[in-house]
Amino acid sequence: MDPALLTPMMQHYVELKRQYPHAILLYRLGDFYEMFFQDAQLVSRELELVLTGREAGAIGRVPMCGIPYHAFDRYAAQLVAKGYALAVCDQMEPADQAKGLVRREVTRVITPGTVIEEELLQARQNNYLAAIVRLRGSKQTVWGLAYADISTGEFWVCQGEGQEQLEQELARLQPAEILLPTEEGLGLGLMRPGDPQAPLGLPGQYTYTLRPAEPFELATARENLLQTYGLRSLEGLGCEGLPLAIRAAGGLLHYLEETQKNLVQPSPQGGHPLLRPPRTYQLTDYLILDTQTRRNLELTQTIREGAFVGSLLWVLDRSRTAMGGRTLRRWLLQPLRDPEQIRLRQDTIQELLESPSLRTRLGSLLDSLYDLERLANRVASGTANPRELVALGSSLGKLPQLAELVAEAQTPLLQSLQQVDPALVDLGHRIEHTLLPSPPPVLTEGGLIRPGVDAELDRLRQQVEQDRHWIAQLEKTERERTGIPTLKVGFNKAFGYYLSISRAKAQQVPKEYIRKQTLTNEERFITPELKEKEARILTAQTEINQREYELFVQLRQEAGSQAAAIRQVAQTLAAVDALFGLAEVAVQQGYTRPVITADRRLIIEEGRHPVVEKSLPQGLFVPNSVRLGSPHGPDLIVLTGPNMSGKSTYLRQIGLIQILAQMGSFVPARRAELGLCDRVFTRIGAVDDLATGQSTFMVEMNETANILNHAGERSLVLLDEIGRGTATFDGLSIAWAVAEYLATQVRARTIFATHYHELNQLETLLPNVANFQVVVKELRDRIIFLHQVQPGGADRSYGIEVGRMAGLPQPVIERAKQVLALVEQHSRIGLGLRSQGKSRPSSNNPKKRFKQESNSRGIPDCDAKAGDQLSLIPTSLYPEEL
Ligand SMILES: Nc1ncnc2c1ncn2[C@@H]1O[C@H](COP(=O)(O)OP(=O)(O)OP(=O)(O)O)[C@@H](O)[C@H]1O
Ligand SMILES: [Mg+2]
């Protein structure tokens, strides 16, 4: 576009827009943020706002769309939620003081990952900005990941191998935005979710921002980290030997510098004003839960509706603050593997559990705290509004009370609240003594500062008070002086205060009255004295507002300089709150403290499903036990039982109890001894994944392959009806082979729920497999679900019975029964089973024979002599063909 065709202001706009081509540019003009050209069209469409126009010079009228500045947060939230980035251009000087064109600059770029506005954030969920650097080798991708939440200060780095592991970390974090160094052939810019050009090999559901490669280079990134945190080496951060992690972190910091110009100013204390120094972690520090497992076990949302209600987190989260809620969610998605850390959390829960009075009082104190973690960053970034500062002050003011409350505490976490940083208490007091308790949300209209704080402010206010009083009295004095009883003092926007007199009496007014307006029944006058007072009030009011604003900003800066210390207590409080919530659940739901061991045992006595138990009337849930992990029990349990009997519930409850234990929580069981797991795998139900072009069965097999390839002795594997999605014989064969492989090769602790009753034969063949069944009571005309798990295998599924209960038409039920009888009598599988019964004399116990023949570990190799035994099955299944 030829600049000569544009007014100077529009030239400036176009110039800025060129610098931020991937963001919507919001250009401040007076009380509005205006957008022009395509941005205007886009925003008017997305937000359903009126598209207007503006004269832009010789070019004529151009499209324009505006939002009032005071509604900025609301509209910005909508745009960011849709995955857009916003470049906010503010006026850097008051329009009336500008010589020529008002100076305007882009002060902030808001992108989905760099949001700090309360309206744009979810209270109980982190909002992560991630950065990834990948090195794609011939065999394996090596990657570095950095992620941060600029609303709370969290900052982590990690380096790992394997595309899948990276995707799982992303699935855990659900980053709002992912930064990548641009690669050859790709440009710069932002890709909204679902963009068909999503970066090679990465999931399409995220927002990606492609960045220049330079800040992601090792030397640059390292220098950036060292500089930012005032360090001489990265040794202390633990990432010295992790070049890809460093590169990702450097790219992330650089992005913040560039987009958050006004927020990210060097902090006087050194360090980053918004992010604490990055912490390094490894995937193996934590219990690994893959995406399927998080989904299948419904940790944070239900499978069917994606709802929070009905998830494990719904049962667990009794924390009182949003920061406690966020912490709990993080713990749930990233359970521990370090027994010492688990014990620390358990200790705190136990202390709270054993002291109801401590718990009650702690609960009400926590209730009165605000989200200190986010408030810390609101003050650090200089964006906190008066109400937020008041919330900060009142929360800090509670710290001494908290310290007193935990004075006798025995566990380290609670003890760490005993020492209160006096600077924070001071700050809290100063905020409380400076700010009025319920100030308006805006900064520039006064009403913020208490009397007695500032002498000048008090003087101005007093003067305004006197002048107002004088005006209030004026009606009375002027009535007396003029002898006009109907004289009134009025006010309107157009010309301020005036004296109103009915037209009939207009002749009686004193001569110093100046006529301003004549209405039908009334004449309006002013006097020089009145105008003088009025002007004085107006100037004083402006001065007051200005003074209050200054005092407020000063106080906010003071608070900002303590951000790191606030963040630190906030973190402790968040952890205390999360554990407080877990203690509450433990009390209300009768959870017990599990014993954590280093071996492979998984012993649960009278365990319950935390969510199902909550949704049933009290006492109706039937507890069940389990022993897994040789030598404490079998390694693999084949679980059979009728439809609707409770197999899936049992299987999931074991996984949930293990996860609860490793996140440090108590568990719904009478007693539990649990060896630490490295991973929990699940394969449950059939979910179509049409989006990725995979069939139901293909998804099932993919997930199964993943389990067989990655599970180990330390893993817990939960398989629900493997092989169901294909022809019966294929499915049965696969189920058999998978179970056998898990028991003999992987030796993972496994629960294998199935309707293939043939699998019960594995118990007789393999020493570390046992059969369990969920029993029902069969009456003459119906069955009763007992939901009890017992040793032994079931031989019927009562599927037709369940169909009847579900309301299948009677003729269909009758016909199904006929077909079933025929099938059982004549099918090859039926024949096979019956002939197998004959061919196996009861005296010849195959389990004994198997043990003699197998190798010294008692576990056969797949191709070992045990094959003789395994051949039993194919011959019996396909008797006619062989
Ligand atoms: N231990 C229990 N105590 C009380 N109710 C239970 C218990 N276990 C399961 N139930 C109830 O039974 C219902 C069915 O359980 P579940 O889905 O586990 O059965 P299933 O054996 O897996 O059935 P299917 O073979 O059809 O998949 C649950 O929704 C729950 O309401
Ligand atoms: Mg089931």
Curated annotation (Swiss-Prot):
ATP binds at residues 641-648. Residues 833-867 are annotated as: Disordered. Residues 836-845 have a biased composition (Polar residues). GO terms for cellular component: cytosol. Gene3D superfamilies: 1.10.1420.10, DNA repair protein MutS, domain I, MutS, connector domain, P-loop containing nucleotide triphosphate hydrolases. Keywords: ATP-binding, DNA damage, DNA repair, DNA-binding, Nucleotide-binding. GO terms for molecular function: ATP binding; ATP-dependent DNA damage sensor activity; damaged DNA binding; mismatched DNA binding. GO terms for biological process: mismatch repair. This protein is involved in the repair of mismatches in DNA. It is possible that it carries out the mismatch recognition step. This protein has a weak ATPase activity. NCBIfam families: mutS1, PRK05399.1. Belongs to the DNA mismatch repair MutS family. This is DNA mismatch repair protein MutS. It comes from Synechococcus sp. (strain JA-3-3Ab) (Cyanobacteria bacterium Yellowstone A-Prime).
